[in-house]
Amino acid sequence: MKYLNKIQSVFIGGKKFFVLLLLLMAIFMSIAIADYIIPPDDPVYPFLEATQSLGYTEKLTSVYPQYHDEIINELTHMLSLDVAVSYKKLAEYHLKRLSLDSSDGFESALYPIKKIPQSFISIFTNHSHKNRLITYNNNNFSVFLSGIIGLDYDILKSDTDDKHRLLKYYGLEFGGNISENIGLFSVFRKGHYAGDAYFTRADSVQLISDNWENPEKVEIETECFLQTNLLNFSIGYGNFQLGKGITSSIILNKDISPFPYIKVSKQFGDFSYLSLYSQLVPDSLKNETEYESKSYALQMLSYQTDKLALTIGECSIYGDRNFDISYSTPLIMYKLVDFANQSRDNVNAFIMASYMPFKGVMVYNNLFIDDIKLSRLTTNKYLSGFAEQLGVSYSFEKIPLNITFEGTAVGPRTYCHRRDLTYSHRDQLLGYPNGSNQLNLAIQAHYLLPGLEFKVLYSNMQQGSISNDPFKPQPNTEFLAGEISRKQNIVTSIHYNFTPELQFHLRYEYENKDDKVKSFLYSGIELKY
């Protein structure tokens, strides 16, 4: 009874608790068809982004990852249009690669035993349908299981360094619809590094072991998805990207350590609503220190058509407690008022917009508002607490080539906050990764073929020495104040799927920061069967 009273107190009274129970019962009685996510690093996303500016997709989107059925519907819609042969071949390739079409019952690449040689040979022969270790299909129960083995070898060269690291890993991928209303996706990779210890620790985004002699790398992404006629619910462990961009998102970027989350979403016509709650890891966490709670809640409302996508949202990082239902509903807007009254919470707002003025051209804009005061907007410190990202993308109609220009300005003091509530997770910024008080100009060329992705990116960043570290208390100042440091990057990457099961990647990165030059070569091979 005491436990029930505690639950009721969260909703401020038994009547509200009873109403919530009725709402949950109504939700679970209005079941729809399930679905599951496609990971944000899947090669289908660059293809969909390139075709959005050509009007080949039904809706523009700027939230990743997306769901399997949504992507299949977009690819199917594209094949119904009069598009260039090169784009049609790419759509067919991804449609076959992502399809779950299989015969009813149980299938395995290892059973019967005599099938093993044929399964092994198929890894190296040309085909478009993706083979899997195990598949099972029976009415609404349709799942797959694939094993993963891989090898990465990376090199760092500079005037003073010549380092390398080797990663051998294995894993599993599981997904599908396990009932009429529940979808599931999970991928797991685990490996051990060898090579230079300091170069290895530079990949600390995924490292979980403090053993310098044998550091482990673990990658986990999973989500269980429940779709109903009222609301869609997800519980998972992973990360997201909000907003288009060729460098990184200024709102929420996907290149950070994953985190646990609960997500509620709903599509109604051209509008959609998304609520996200997550438990973050505090910065500079050590085994001997107390684990202080750090939570993240986000709300956003989107309007999407085939030519325009507009999203307004707000998010909050708070401590001192874990799940708080007031942060997981639109009531979070009242926290903006609390902030004006010296609340501890780190409350932010954001806007994302994409517009296709004419065929082939996409203009996108992302705005992140960390702190705003009307009196400061009329001074030379007006950019303090703001981050702005503007890009123009052009896709050629006859060949799958996309060129994008992008400018990103992150104002002084953006992302920082008092009382250890920096806009961060495990010492990594949730927003733009290079800190604040910076201007970054970039251009990218992206070329696609079935099974092949080629990308060249050039970026030029200038950063002021004042108010550029969000992990420390920062004063308001003018944009690019202090001594200017410059950093140029050239990144060339190739991802090649020899077959749908066997893929290679090669990336070369040249970095020149204040005339100090470094070069990186990242290479790898992965078999997923």
Residue positions per predicted region:
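N-terminal cofactor/phosphate-binding cores enriched in small/glycine residues
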Residues: 48
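Bacterial N-terminal signal peptides
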Residues: 19-29
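Short, low-complexity, charge-dense intrinsically disordered segments
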Residues: 3-13
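Boundary at the C-terminal end of the N-terminal hydrophobic targeting segment
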Residues: 31-34
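Outer-membrane beta-barrel channel domains
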Residues: 39-42, 54-62, 67-69, 74-309, ...
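Exposed, low-structure sequence patches enriched in small/polar residues
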Residues: 217, 309-316, 321-529
